[in-house]
Amino acid sequence: PYGANRRSRIDLLLTPAPEAADPRPIYVEVKNTTWTAGALALFPDTVTERGQKHLEELSALLPESRAVLLPCLSRSDVERFAPGDSADPRYGELFRTALAAGVEVLPCRYRFAREGVHWRGLASVETRGPAATPEAP
């Protein structure tokens, strides 16, 4: 458990090996997204108070811990990631605050094929999503 009331659960808690250069624990919050505007993946696609809380809690872990937001971009046709400001403006504000505070955002790109899921690297991060609402999934 972590967070202000120690009532939240993190998706992954990575504990560095004793020989690691950075001894801080790494808290990882995973988000899945399928909503896009062209080659831009967006999260969230609706208001998410839970997602807002996660961003606040990740920010509060700094600097004693590393905090990572790990968006899984479940579309093979995306190259970039941004907050879904048009769906949840508050999440967008908290996203930018968290990024400025040092929360790491690592959007993972994949290619889905019959033989499996293939890693395509990290998407670039944009700090603002489109002003108009693209069609939600």
Language-model features: locations:
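Residues at the starts of beta-strands that form the adenosine-phosphate
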Residues: 24, 66-68, 104
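Secondary-structure boundary motif
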Residues: 18-19, 60-64, 100
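Domain-level recognition of nuclease-like catalytic cores that cleave nucleotide substrates
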Residues: 74-137
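A broadly tuned "polar low-complexity/structure-edge" signature
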Residues: 1-17, 56, 79-81, 85, ...
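Active-site metal-binding core of divalent-cation-utilizing nuclease and nuclease-like domains
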Residues: 1-34, 53, 115-117
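Residue-identity detector for threonine
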Residues: 15, 33-36, 46-48, 97, ...
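Nucleic-acid nuclease catalytic cores
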Residues: 31-32, 37-52, 56-87, 109-111
